[in-house]
Amino acid sequence: MIQKNTLLDVADNSGARKVLCIGLLNGKKSASVGDVIVVSTKVVIPRGKVSKGKVYKAVIVRVKKAVRRLDGSVIKFSSNAVVLINDQGDPLGTRVFGPVKKLPFGLFSKVMSLAVEVL
């Protein structure tokens, strides 16, 4: 579960490495996989597509909290990770690193197609 002031890893090659959650767009106090959040970049690599301190939207692709599926299986990851997106929902980077949990159907198909592994 992600809430305000959570430090997250970035799972794409947009140039950001760490971001801070500064707002939730789902109207609740916490967000999970597939939710869109507002983030501020904290750690960036030189000559990347993003700048330090700028505000972006991001979709959550991995959470540490165990998520139960309908068939009874449980999935949890070792880190909280996001992919930076633009206003249309397309990713800013061209690659997505690490596994990605299935996102809501039709909303982030571009992010899922770039992922190495979809669980």
Swiss-Prot record:
Keyword line: Ribonucleoprotein, Ribosomal protein, RNA-binding, rRNA-binding
A Pfam family recorded for this sequence: Ribosomal_L14
Domain of life of the organism encoding this protein: Bacteria
Gene Ontology molecular-function annotations: large ribosomal subunit rRNA binding; structural constituent of ribosome
PROSITE patterns noted in UniProt: RIBOSOMAL_L14
GO BP annotations, alphabetical order: translation
Subunit structure and binding partners: Part of the 50S ribosomal subunit. Forms a cluster with proteins L3 and L19. In the 70S ribosome, L14 and L19 interact and together make contacts with the 16S rRNA in bridges B5 and B8.
Described function: Binds to 23S rRNA. Forms part of two intersubunit bridges in the 70S ribosome.
Family: Belongs to the universal ribosomal protein uL14 family.
Name of the protein in its database record: Large ribosomal subunit protein uL14
Gene behind the chain: rplN
